[in-house]
C-alpha cells in the first residue's frame, strides 16, 4: 500500500486538497477532533502519516513513506537522500537575512566580520555566509529568532519569511534573500526507480493536477 508523509502546519490543507484531486482523500486529518497520526484514504488505496515538516524527508528517506510533501526550505537545510519530483506551487515563502531597521546594515556584507547570525536554519545560514567569504558565528535558535537582534545577541538573523509581518512588527527589515521556497513532492529513491505500488501513476496524476492549478 502506498504511504504518503504529510506535514503538520501551513502546508497540510493544500497538500490534502492536491491529493484529493487525484483520488486520495486524507481530509480526516483536517478534523480538529482527530488525534490520529496515521489514516487510510477513504477508498483504502493508500495511507498517510501526519508528521512534523522537518521529519517528512526522514520518513521518505528511510522508506516508511514512498511519497512526501515538504517545503524546499527543509530540503535545503537537511539535504536528505530523496528523489525531488515536483514543485507543487503552493506554500510560497523566502529565506532571508534580516536586521534591526534602526541598524546601519543594508547588505549582508555590511555585517561585521565574526559577528553573530541567529537561525534555526544553521546549515543554510553557514553555507550562505561562506559563499560571501564573510566569517560569522551562527547561533542556533529554534523559536522567536527575531529576538536575536532585538536583544543584541546577534547582528542579524536568517529565517523563513512569508508576508514579512512578524519582522515588521518587531522592527526588523530584510536585507537579502537566500532563496525562495515552495512545497515539493519527494519520493523514496528505490521505490521511485522500481515503481513500487504503481508509484509512477500517482506521480503523473499529481504532476498533471499541479499544471491544471497553475
Curated annotation (Swiss-Prot):
SUPFAM superfamilies: Periplasmic binding protein-like II. Catalyzes the condensation of ATP and 5-phosphoribose 1-diphosphate to form N'-(5'-phosphoribosyl)-ATP (PR-ATP). Has a crucial role in the pathway because the rate of histidine biosynthesis seems to be controlled primarily by regulation of HisG enzymatic activity. It comes from Nostoc punctiforme (strain ATCC 29133 / PCC 73102). GO terms for cellular component: cytoplasm. This is ATP phosphoribosyltransferase. Lacks the C-terminal regulatory region which is replaced by HisZ. It catalyses: 1-(5-phospho-beta-D-ribosyl)-ATP + diphosphate = 5-phospho-alpha-D-ribose 1-diphosphate + ATP. Its EC number is 2.4.2.17.
